[in-house]
Amino acid sequence: MIEGLVSIIMPSYNAARFIGESINSVLLQTYSNWELLIVDDCSKDNSVEVVRKFANIDKRVVLFSLEKNVGAAAARNVAIEHAQGQYIAFLDSDDVWDEYKLEKQLAFMKQYSYVFTFSNYYVMEENGKKTENIVKVPSSLSYHQYLRNTICLLYTS
């Protein structure tokens, strides 16, 4: 484990259309101590070529290519096995982050001594336009609500 490092986990399957913008949103982060671990799950489009272009420019972007299609959850697990960071963040290949996302989230976690956080996010249209629809974090969540509520597990932005 490398202290302060954020390991960003990104599964990818036929994501060539969006993955460049997603990677760019990581490259633009104001917090720069991160590694981006992208696991390609046997894409049939040119996703791998798009990722390789970024990996050749920035060594923090690391590509793993699977030999068999295993699905997003298993692809995430492959990346987690290679993660070196103190923190793990999930970002899907068709999502983007605000440039201050890591900086703000880490500051919040440190300020309140949290080991796990998630945040509000905007729903985006397929063309990349941000809608006014915001999925908000509940103000409180009991243990039983947490077990019933999958927002922590399904949404990665």
Model-based region annotation:
Residues 1-157:
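Nucleotide-sugar donor-binding/catalytic module of glycosyltransferases
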